[in-house]
Amino acid sequence: MADRLDPVALTSGMIDIKSVSRWNNVAVSEYVESWMKAHGFETEWLEYKDENGERKVNIVGKKGDGKGGMGFFSHTDTVPGQEEDWEPYRGVVEGDRLYGRGSCDMKGPLAATMIAAAAVDASKLKKAVIVAATSDEELGGEGARFTTEHSKLMEGALPAYGIVAEPTLLTPVYAHKGGATITVTAKGHAAHTSTDLGISANFLIAPFLAEMAMLAKSVKTDPRYMSHEFNPPTNGFNLVLTDHGTRSNVFAARCTAIVGFRPGPHDKSEELVEEIAQRARHYGFDVTTQMNRGYRVEPDAAVVQLASQLSGGRQPETVPYGTDAPRFAAKVPCVVFGPGSITQAHTVGEYIDLAQLHEATAIYRRMIETVCM
């Protein structure tokens, strides 16, 4: 049984299954559900199709019965593995680290939650333990939203304490920033430059880009868009640009600018999104917007203090990146708390320290014993 409940082996098994966000995550979800069933979980398969028709699966596992227990929330999707630079889809232990895409973000943390819940005796549980493995976190969190809206297992055993197990080096995180994108497309008229009959979308979008350059400077000091609980307090205002591969001897038919920044939990970011959209529409450009709010729970909230106490008194902090916490917090008070370092996420050579993985598993089990038994 000890070998079967090895978080390193379980993480490696999931790393070996490619589950990049833009494609489906069916295979890794089948693996997770099969493992859960083999270890005494009642499971629920929640599936939808994304805008590209890809199947996206969310697995909810439950041990025990009764509301007011523990919920552990992770995702099975990953960013692309950059296969030209390393072998990302093979879990490899070297020294005191486990390497592979998703080892840190976040198949390792998911494995720790699964092992912790599997290790407890269901007959001794007075409240249920929920373990969820969702899709599309890297693309905006649709899987978490879908799960909170459609999971009957979770609704019937709604936890009082939620752990979003993203990598925080096992430091409790009570607040984080979100993400906003404004996609602006200028349309010209394609033609060979020898005819001089085209209209370059690159020239059309240039005045808007100049406005964004000025706006980027002003938002750094505008108190409406700053959150002083965070380091840095600014929102990381950025812009990327593409004319979709147009060559220099062709007038560009399209040019797309994507403006992005990180909203705080309670700033005025909606106003900034609307201002950018209005400026783009002034020029007649196509505009789409998306904004995911940041997250904040009081640092003295019960779930935050639980993580702090059971991790040896680590003090709660804030982080500038985003997680699925806002989606799950619609139902369950959450703290972000997981093994591994965010500096390893999305990197070539991504790894998780084995000591962190084992420590997380032990802490998660103590949480279950404290809250559910």
Where are these regions (language model features)?
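Glycine/serine-rich anion-binding loops at beta->alpha junctions
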Residues: 96-112, 192
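Phosphate-handling active-site elements
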Residues: 94-96, 116-131, 155-158, 212-222, ...
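Short beta-strand segments
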Residues: 73-75, 132-134, 163-166, 185-187, ...
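Acidic-glycine-rich active-site phosphate/pyrophosphate-binding loop
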Residues: 79-94, 158-159, 174-185
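Metal-dependent amide/peptide-bond hydrolase catalytic core
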Residues: 2, 174, 181-373
